[in-house]
């Protein structure tokens, strides 16, 4: 019987991926529009779709679900391409691996994520530091 469900945030709680995630956003937007954004929106505390919508505003583009979806697909591809760079510029947050490993051994606890990242990117960031093995995603 599961008695506790623990939901973890990823960015800043379990891992820090350096500027790889932000760079993937920049590249995804440029892939779709053929030009870079004039600036990067504040990303902290937002979901990936929210960030995409802010990029659309910066780009002066109309917000369409089709466009949001295209950018999110490119974001997924761009982060996957950069996955091997994440460990070099980022890190697992102190204590994250130890607490997740300990909780994984408790049959009354399930650890998962509640994050603003799209699901594939959540896995990429966690896997970069081997944390995905202790979470039910």
Show which residues each predicted segment covers.
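A short, structured active-site edge motif that brings together acidic residues
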Residues: 40-44, 67-73, 132-137
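Short beta->alpha linker loops
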Residues: 20, 47, 91-95, 117-118
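An amphipathic alpha-helix signature
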Residues: 22-26, 48-49, 53, 72, ...
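Substrate-recognition/cap helix-loop segment adjacent to the acidic, metal-dependent catalytic center
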Residues: 30-32, 55, 59, 101-112, ...
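Active-site neighborhood of HAD-like aspartate-dependent phosphohydrolases
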Residues: 1-44, 56-57
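Metal-dependent phosphoesterase signature
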Residues: 56-98
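Short, acidic loop-to-helix structural element flanking the phosphoryl-transfer center
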Residues: 2, 7, 81-113
